[in-house]
């Protein structure tokens, strides 16, 4: 991986459906299986470093 955070699991926030808190932050995460950045909604809790503010930022860090 270009950077370690890109190898972390898809960034979610602790809930099976991906949203466990009341925040609504459109975000991007690198999906190592698909080898591409994908969009998701971050709820504001938990998660990991595989979370980026834009597709461009994700691609610059991970692709």
Curated annotation (Swiss-Prot):
Disulfide bonds join 6-62, 21-45, 37-58. GO terms for molecular function: serine-type endopeptidase inhibitor activity. Residues 6-62 form the BPTI/Kunitz inhibitor domain. It comes from the Eukaryota. It holds the Pfam family Kunitz_BPTI. PROSITE patterns: BPTI_KUNITZ_1 (PS00280), BPTI_KUNITZ_2 (PS50279). Serine protease inhibitor. This peptide can inhibit, in-vivo, acrosin and, to a lower level, plasma kallikrein. It probably plays a role in Drosophila reproduction. PANTHER family: KUNITZ-TYPE PROTEASE INHIBITOR-RELATED (PTHR10083). This is Male accessory gland serine protease inhibitor.
């Amino acid at each position: 991986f270009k950077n370690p955070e890109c190898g972390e699991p898809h960034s979610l926030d602790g809930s099976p459906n991906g949203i466990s808190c009341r925040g609504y932050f459109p975000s991007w995460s690198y999906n190592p299986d698909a080898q591409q950045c994908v969009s998701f909604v971050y709820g504001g809790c938990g998660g990991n470093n595989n979370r980026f503010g834009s597709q461009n930022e994700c691609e610059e860090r991970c692709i």
